[in-house]
Curated annotation (Swiss-Prot):
It holds the Pfam family MFS_1. Belongs to the major facilitator superfamily. Set transporter family. It is found in: Cell inner membrane. One of its GO terms (cellular component) is plasma membrane. This is Sugar efflux transporter B. The chain crosses the membrane at residues 13-33, 52-72, 84-101, 105-124, 152-172, 174-194, 219-239, 253-273, 283-303, 308-328, 344-364, 366-386. It comes from the Bacteria. Coiled coil: none annotated. It is a multi-pass membrane protein. CDD domains: MFS_Set. Keywords: Cell inner membrane, Cell membrane, Membrane, Sugar transport, Transmembrane, Transmembrane helix, Transport. GO terms for molecular function: carbohydrate:proton symporter activity. InterPro entries: MFS, MFS_dom, MFS_trans_sf, Sugar_efflux.
Length: 393
């Protein structure tokens, strides 16, 4: 991927590309080992009520936004994302160790979540580094990013079933220590194999900047992605408890459902990346929203394991297109601001968690877990309204 003699090009190209793929997978697996079981961990191990579970997700998202915005400002100013990613991996590993051995709700919320926020920021910083690397080496950024996103989805194929197997078959301690190992290996890979890409002084920015262009459309896209990720967060928080406590189905089904959706997301992301220039990002996002609408209607009606698994195709289209195209949409609306654009996109995920944590906790506390899917349906309808007003790029 570097400009080098022909004889050396294949080796350099393969090494750098493989390193990015492995790091994308490892950052994905570290998250996929923790997030799917977190609501069950808080309920069964920490003994938190539904409202406290929702508040935990909300607080986690708020702290995550503060941390990621701070790191985005430093990364766009300093430009050396490699050391920053390694630093994030180290703190992510420490967070996993804390969750493995501690069961105090407030220690986990204020210290564990603070450390976890740095760990989760390793992923968007890796994508920002990949975008800059693709731009400087002339690689097709859309397809390269889609392939990396597919690696994260591959991690989510393996991660949720493995997380449930480790947590239910052994213990949550074993599960979190496994995630810590993933962070350690990821940090080593980044340090030795990813390129350092310092920015020149004229390109440096003093703070995390607002979009220089397309501000209205960037705001609309922020709302759209926030609502879409919010529905997905509602699903992740609520679905395992809904499956176990209301449908009385096996615990492992929740992990299989998440893994199935992630597996189907991989071809969805690659296809979306291929057709992004031909069909436009806006049309692809519209397709995703329609699939999401059908999915959440299905979740309100379905109760059989086979039907729940079949619905994951719609979920995969919904999240696969959002995950593969949403970040690129931000980057195209904010040219020259790769770090800020990527972090802004990532913060739509975190704001989605804020909304979802509050709604899931309140709905489950007052009504039941099934009622949460009605809130998701309303958010999908609001997304359609916003999507009709944004321009294509």
């Amino acid at each position: 991927m570097h400009n080098s003699p022909a004889a050396a090009a294949p080796k350099s190209f393969d090494l750098t590309s493989t390193a990015f793929l492995i790091v994308a997978f490892l950052t994905g697996i570290a998250g996929a080992l923790q997030t799917p079981t977190l609501s069950i961990f808080l309920t069964d191990e920490v003994h938190a009520r539904p409202g406290m579970v929702g508040f935990f997700f909300t607080g986690s998202a708020v702290i995550g936004i503060i941390v990621s915005q701070f790191l985005a400002g430093r990364s766009d100013k300093k430009g050396d994302r490699k050391k920053l990613i390694v630093f994030c991996c180290v703190l992510g590993m420490l967070a996993c160790v804390l969750f493995a051995w501690n069961r105090n709700y407030f220690i986990l919320l204020f210290i564990g979540v603070f450390l976890s926020s740095f760990g989760s920021t390793a992923n968007p910083q890796m994508f920002a580094l990949a975008r800059e690397h693709a731009d400087r080496t002339g690689r097709e950024a859309v397809m390269f990013s889609s392939i990396l996103r597919a690696q994260v989805s591959l991690a989510w194929v393996i991660g949720p079933p493995l997380a449930y197997a480790l947590a239910m078959g052994f213990s949550f301690t074993v599960m979190y220590l496994s995630a810590a190992v993933a962070f350690i290996v990821c940090g080593v890979m980044v340090w030795f194999f990813l390129p350092s890409m310092r920015k020149d002084a004229p390109l440096a920015t003093g703070t995390l900047e607002a979009p220089r262009r397309n501000r209205r459309d960037t705001l609309l896209l922020f709302v759209i992605c926030t609502l879409m990720w919010g529905t997905n967060s509602l699903y992740i928080i609520n679905m395992p408890l809904f499956i176990i406590n209301e449908l009385h189905l096996p615990e492992k089904l929740a992990g299989v459902m998440m893994g199935t959706a992630a597996g189907l997301e991989i071809p969805t992301m690659l296809i979306a990346g291929y057709f992004a220039k031909r069909l436009g990002k806006r049309l692809l996002m519209c397709i995703a929203v329609v699939a999401g609408l059908c999915f959440y209607v299905g979740m309100l009606l379905a109760h059989a394991p086979a039907t729940l698994l079949g619905l994951q195709l719609l979920n995969a289209i919904y999240i696969g297109i959002l995950g593969g195209i949403g970040m690129l949409y931000f980057q195209d609306l904010m040219p020259g601001q790769a770090g800020s654009a990527t972090t802004l996109y990532t913060n739509t995920i975190r704001v989605g968690w804020i909304i979802a944590g509050s709604l899931a906790g309140i709905a489950a506390e007052i009504w039941n877990y099934h009622a949460v899917f009605w809130f998701a349906l309303v958010m999908i309808v609001a997304t359609m309204f916003c999507l009709a007003r944004i321009k294509d790029v």
